[in-house]
Design a protein with these regions (language model features):
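Non-catalytic cell-wall polysaccharide-engagement segments
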Residues: 2-34, 46-47, 63, 102, ...
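Short extracytoplasmic
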Residues: 38-66
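Extracytoplasmic
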Residues: 51, 65-70, 75, 88-91, ...
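A generic alpha-helix surface/boundary motif
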Residues: 53-54, 94-95, 99, 123
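Cell-wall polysaccharide-cleaving catalytic domain and substrate-binding groove, primarily
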Residues: 76-93, 97-100, 154, 214
Length: 227
């Protein structure tokens, strides 16, 4: 029993968090649709990154996230297109999956509202950050990289790669190290490894490229705009 709990601990925790969110009343989650009132878009010359700068700033303050990071995610997900749909069903500027949005009682049609879409994406980002359970000594860049990757592919893949790195006595909280182990999860030798719970990761290179792209765009936005 102890071995089972040790191996599947993170999956049990993630399932519990998902179920808990589904049953918490909307007003107890801090999500208030009244707060998502329409804001006029900024005109050229009034914004630094996008016409949605004010919305990004407001929502980022609410959730204690760098607004420039949210902008970088939006750029990489949709080029700031609030009407974007992906072939896999992701919706809106931040490409939120409808089944994820339902955890916060947000319907698919509501995800076309930029403010609601950004807010749900921000909540998802923060929930991924909590699932990854970073020690205090982990650098902000590494925290950001792991969380961005989780936003793209889910936290379980990242946890598998970290566990694999730890098995081979590599630092499991350094992105530049663990990213190599993420790539290995496409290989049968490694996705069947005792340290791995989630099975094969078929397109790990996409997550690596996505994460590095978001980090690059974020660094550009940091040089352009103040926090």
């Amino acid at each position: 029993m102890k071995i089972f709990l040790k191996k599947y601990y993170h999956l049990i925790i993630m399932a519990a968090v998902t179920i808990a969110f589904a049953y918490i009343p909307l007003n107890k989650r801090g999500f208030n649709v009244v707060d998502m009132e329409q804001e006029p878009l900024l005109e050229p010359g009034e914004y630094i990154i996008s016409p949605y700068d004010n919305i990004f700033r407001r929502i980022a303050r609410r959730h204690d996230v760098d607004w420039r990071l949210l902008c970088a995610l939006a750029y990489c997900e949709s080029r700031f297109n609030p009407d974007a749909y992906s072939p896999r069903g992701a919706v809106g500027m931040m490409q939120v999956m409808p089944h994820i949005a339902r955890h916060w009682d947000v319907m698919e049609s509501e995800l076309l509202d930029p403010a609601i879409n950004i807010d749900v994406a921000c909540r998802l980002y923060k929930s991924m950050q909590k699932m990854l359970r970073f020690p205090k000594e982990v650098s902000e860049r590494d925290k950001m990289a792991f969380t961005i990757a989780s936003y793209n592919c889910g936290a379980s893949r990242i946890i598998d790669a970290r566990n694999l790195a730890a098995y081979y006595d590599e630092p499991k909280y350094e992105w530049d190290v663990v990213s190599d182990y993420i790539l290995l999860l496409s290989s049968e030798e490694f996705y069947n490894h005792e340290a791995v719970c989630g099975g094969q990761f078929k397109e790990p290179h996409i997550t690596i490229a996505y994460t590095n792209k978001v980090l690059s765009v974020y660094e550009k936005y940091v040089s352009m705009a103040e926090e």
